[in-house]
Regions:
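Active-site rim elements
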Residues: 21-26, 104-107
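Acidic/histidine-rich alpha-helical segments that form the ligand environment
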Residues: 96-132, 145-151
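Short, contiguous alpha-helical
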Residues: 1-16, 23-94, 135-175
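A short alpha-helix capping/helix-coil boundary motif
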Residues: 15-18, 99
Length: 175
């Protein structure tokens, strides 16, 4: 029997966090978007996750998972925390390699994504949204709040792509 992406249950902040401090709401919305991407992958085979269904784009559901693992690592661990961790899939010569999924191992890539999320949670635990850092690429001061905001919009945008990709794979729709 071939591997199938696990199905997950999402916790929608609209129903779980109606009142809360800014950090709790930011964490809830970021986690919701993380869960949404995995939810869109749930129940699909590795081959289905690799399908590129919206020509001429090279986007696939697995490519989006790999991309978001790279983005999480880059913004939270490399830029914010200053960790010296390399790319997961990309190289300095190919900054979009995460979308090259022909020979990718979907099960391993989803596990890598989950590990990266856990490492990011540890990195940001107890840190103030007001905490600032100098972005090494742009050489400008940024806050953790800004990183949360950009990550929520990044997921929202790519989850829209995931909606279309999933519908093209098997007709499943939903938000």
């Amino acid at each position: 029997m071939s591997w199938i992406a696990p199905e997950i249950t999402r916790v929608h902040p609209q129903f779980a966090e109606l009142v809360g401090d800014e950090r709790s709401l930011a964490d809830a919305w970021l986690d919701f978007h993380r869960q949404t991407l995995l939810w869109k992958c749930g129940g699909l085979t590795a081959e289905q996750l690799k399908l590129r269904q919206v020509a001429p784009s090279n986007l696939s559901l697995l490519g989006l998972v790999r991309h978001m693992a790279e983005v999480e690592r880059d913004w939270f661990r490399t830029r914010f925390a200053g960790e010296r961790v390399g790319y997961l899939y990309c190289t300095d010569d190919d900054l979009t390699a995460e979308f090259d999924v022909e020979t990718a191992d979907a099960e391993s890539d989803l596990a890598t994504y989950a590990r990266e999320i856990e490492l990011v949670r540890r990195t940001t635990a107890g840190r103030s949204l007001d905490e600032t850092f100098t972005d090494p690429r742009r050489e400008v001061e940024m806050s953790l709040r800004w990183v949360y905001s950009v990550m929520i919009q990044e997921y929202a945008r790519h989850n829209g792509h995931a909606d279309l990709l999933r519908e093209r794979v098997d007709g499943a729709v939903g938000h």
